[in-house]
Amino acid sequence: SAGGSTGGGAAGLAAGMFPLASGTDLGGSLRIPAAFCGVQGIRPTVGLVPAGPKKLPFQSLGVPGPMARCSHDLGVFLEVIAKPHHLDPLSPGFSFKFSEKRVRSVLRLAYIKDPAGIGIDKEVADKCLETFHALSQLGHKLDIIEVDLADGREAFEVLRAQSMVNAYLDYTEKLDEMGENISGNIKRGLGQNPKDIARAEITRGEQWKKLAETFNSYDALLTPTLPITPFPVENNYPESIDGKLTRSYIDWFSTTFV
């Protein structure tokens, strides 16, 4: 699998078909394929890259962003597309400027092995630790820390389902014509009540606060992008992670959305 949803963009970058690609990222749609294909993709801060006129201008889950083969190209591309836009109410009143100049020569970095609490396959965990030690040898200060974001999984599922209802409101009578993943999310969203959504938003705020507080001590947080390596393209999703059965379609990319 090339990952998704911007799997074509990531595969094309890796194959040398084009130098840049773009897409949107709600729960990992830029970062997942980038990780599977060995290129780079980021989910920018909400509003940094304007979406322009759209049906739901105030939604803050899915955001547009760039993909590239290296961090330099990614930064330059982001500078080009991250501009204010008067038809995007979440767009800030400034442009993003890319710079390769370091804020400080020695960075304070924290590694969170399993932020979603779903386990990490050994091959992925070993590679992450190799990178961790390589950064340490370059002189950066690194700590292994624990930040429990497992509650974010349920909150994301609720908010994602609601976002699907918002996006496909005019098509709720045609669910039988849709794929299982989309129709399943819409059905869940239609069955939720306001308390479900309120609890999810509260959890979202609590998770954000946990992460924000870590930046009092660290310049950046390091995590595995995904807990698994690419799986066969014929499979809709992996059946297990670190020897444990997955409970739903989105378990395997929990690390990108908690």
Which residues fall in each region the model found?
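Glycine-rich, small-residue loops and helix-cap segments
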Residues: G75, I81, Q192-V258
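Acyltransferase
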Residues: K122-E146, L169-E173, I197-Y218
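Active-site-proximal alpha-helical scaffold in enzymes
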Residues: S1-A35, M67-A68, L78
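Short pre-catalytic strand/loop immediately N-terminal to key active-site residues, enriched for Gly-Thr
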Residues: S1-G4, G62, L245-Y249
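Short helix-loop capping/hinge segments that flank enzyme active sites or metal/cofactor-binding pockets
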Residues: V103-I112, L159-A212, P224, I228, ...
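A short helix-breaking turn/cap at a secondary-structure junction
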Residues: Q40-D126
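Short connector loops at secondary-structure junctions
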Residues: K141-F156, I186-R188
